[in-house]
């Protein structure tokens, strides 16, 4: 017997749309700062990277957080999420070996309504 697919709950749809909107704002903000967007929503079995951006010889793996207040967004990248992002970054580098010699960094962009996004370079690092 085939499973019936149920539509997603309205709050999940709203959260998804908020995330897409925040990622679009973050990407535009990074481009205005001179970054080139190499990938968005890069998915792997071990995690997802919201944005992969390049500026000169730097690759930034960017986590985007949307919250009602920027202060709340700043605390939204948990250690577990950091590990998943690091694992996804390793997968991205294996799929894009021409960037393996670049400087690597893990950034965050915080997005709140009616505010400019806030870019946090080196929001966390890959050291254990």
Curated annotation (Swiss-Prot):
Pfam family of the protein (one): UPF0102
GO MF terms, alphabetically ordered: nucleic acid binding
Organism domain of life: Bacteria
Transmembrane regions listed in the UniProt entry: none
Similarity section: Belongs to the UPF0102 family.
Protein's recorded name: UPF0102 protein RPB_0420
Organism of derivation: Rhodopseudomonas palustris (strain HaA2)
Taxonomic lineage from the root: Bacteria, Pseudomonadati, Pseudomonadota, Alphaproteobacteria, Hyphomicrobiales
